[in-house]
Amino acid sequence: MPAWTNQKILNTALKQSATDLGCKPEDFLRPDSIVVASQAEPRARKYLELPFSCNLVSYGNNVVASTDEAYRDLVSAYIHRFPPEHCFETPNLHILNDALQKKGHRVCFMAEYFLPDLSALKPIRCWEYELRLLGP
């Protein structure tokens, strides 16, 4: 198996995000934000409850929104109103929340994931630390 590289890590993350959202990995690299229809996908991360009502993901270039068709227009208007980096901030998120709340939903979970930069990782000398088994 080839060694991991920053590019391989990014490609793996893009592929999994695309599976989860129902788009193509290259959609995250486009210059424009897009909306795709959310759908059930057996290869998605198991803890996700699909289809999404609304899920926004950005790798920095744009926002890919995976939504139920009932929210497509309002989510599209939202992600095209602000630059990608501002779609995930308050007070802008309040605008999305207000629109979703009129349809019985609210903004709920926010998560940030960071990909490692392999050039910044340094070996840790774990053998220098004492190992003890703790008990009652």
Name the predicted role of every residue range.
Residues 2-4:
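Contiguous mid-protein beta-loop-alpha structural module that forms a pocket-lining wall or clamp
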Residues 6-8:
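Early transmembrane hairpin of solute transport permeases
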Residues 12-135:
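Acyl-donor-binding surface of acyltransferase catalytic domains
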